[in-house]
Amino acid sequence: MPPRKKETVMSEFERKRLENIAYNNAILSGISTTADKIIPKPAPPKPKRASTPRVKREPVKKEAARPTRQSSRLAGLEADSAVLKRKLDVEAEEEAAKAKAKRMRVSGDLNLGDITVEGRKWESSADGLALLKGLGVRGAQPGVRTFTEKDVKHTKDKGLKDLRLRMSGLKLYEKWAVNDIKIVPQRIYSMCFHPTEEKPIIFAGDKEGAMGVFDASQPTPKIEDDDEDAEYPDPIISAFKTHSRTISSFHFSPTDANAIYSASYDSSIRKLDLDKGISTEIFAPSSSSEDLPISAIDIPTTDPNMIIFSTLHGSLGRQDQRTKPSSAEIWGLTDHKIGGFSLHPRHPYLVATASLDRTLKIWDLRKITGKGDLRHPALLGEHESRLSVSHASWSSSGHIATSSYDDRIKIYSFPSAGEWKAGHDIPAKEMQPTVEIPHNNQTGRWVTILKPQWQRNPQDGWQKFAIGNMNRFVDVYAEDGEQLAQLGGDGITAVPAVAHFHPTKDWVAGGTASGKLCLWM
């Protein structure tokens, strides 16, 4: 039997030490409890469970000031749910309908008082038009000239030198700065002068169907010299939304100076009566859904009731104004777009077309053959360029000027065109250009295509045309290819791509991509 251990007697010191330890632990425990009350410990993560749809309270419906994008996630729609797909389909249909409605042409007569363009620049639209009533008749290098005073000075031919001096002497309009003459809201695609010689009145058409009118003869407002805070008022400019898409071309009636015709990519041709202030539809397809963008119009001087037009679908049409607007005879000439065309001013049965198929073609409206879709005017001759041809413009002397993307202005000469019989076959040799002028025609996406426009009835007898220059000028050339002037000036900050001559006076207008007007007189 093992011996019994002797019980250990706890000393006073050891007992006191254990009491102190117990007391200290009690204090620490109390502090921890107090801290938990002030800053609770993070709750332990709850076990995950299957998600259940939240019960959403019905929100108070508020009338939105304008359409806003809404989150499908916040709306409680799952990414692949049928409800979300339907919602997206409806939104897409609404946007497509809005876009289509914006581009849809407006049929019937339009009162200019109802279609004025809104904005500070055009607040006096009706007042501006009232001034017209009663009138009877490759990479660009901005600022770098390609025709200078030296070219004029070194001209040996006296007649040419005098003409160059006169044309180069045209001055940029000074009553208002170019930046203040915003004739239309968007990029200018077309321009023309009113035929009156009393004062320069310019019409411009923009990318979205607005037509602007500016009377350059209007007086400048008087500002007191001692009034330092006075603001210089803007010029009076009228602007009207006559079309729903780009206005591609203007033409005045040969017999009525109060009638101006406009053509548009919205597939319509309209006639504006300046005295009555009414815009009437002259041509439009029978179906409002048919798309037939019109690229240019011209009116025969021998028959002002007829309107000839070209389309971006490669067709040429003839509309008699005395018949209903959808009764035009239309001929398919090419599978490519026709960017521009013109009639011979003295022999308007001769048509010159410029096309994306790289050709200049001459047609004869006196001889139309074929049946159905194969019916078309007689093709007299054609010339093919290296790249697409943008425009073909007849002069009254029988010259055709074209611009093309091979960076050339070509001039063709047909002085005996009036002697051609119907269906005359032009020899290939005669279809060659007599002059080729190097010219940067690379406009890119944001500048309107450069197109030559002849002066219709020059008072001085010199045949000349104007065309925009990518270096922010307007070039003027004679029928033999000699450059006569390069018009510029201070304050021109964009390319005056759309250039146009007054029919008789030496007035030249240029329109920019920002809707600004440059005018030389």
Curated annotation (Swiss-Prot):
Keyword DNA-binding present in the record's keywords: the answer is: yes
| UniProt biased composition (Basic and acidic residues) | 55-66
Q: Which Gene3D superfamilies match?
A: YVTN repeat-like/Quinoprotein amine dehydrogenase (2.130.10.10)
One GO BP annotation is:
regulation of DNA damage checkpoint
A GO cellular component annotation here is: nuclear periphery
Q: Which domain of life is it from?
A: Eukaryota
Molecular function per GO: DNA binding
* The entry's keywords: DNA damage, DNA-binding, Repeat, WD repeat
> Per its UniProt record, what InterPro entries does this chain match?
WD40/YVTN_repeat-like_dom_sf, WD40_repeat_dom_sf, WD40_rpt, WD_repeat_DNA-damage-binding
User: Positions of the WD repeats?
Assistant: 183-224, 242-282, 333-373, 382-422, 490-521
Where is the stretch described as Disordered?
A: 36-75
Q: What does this protein do?
A: DNA-binding protein that binds to both single- and double-stranded DNA. Binds preferentially to UV-damaged DNA. May be involved in DNA-metabolic processes.
What is stated as this protein's family in its record? Belongs to the WD repeat DDB2/WDR76 family.
Q: What is this protein called?
A: DNA damage-binding protein cmr1
Origin species, per record, is Neurospora crassa (strain ATCC 24698 / 74-OR23-1A / CBS 708.71 / DSM 1257 / FGSC 987)
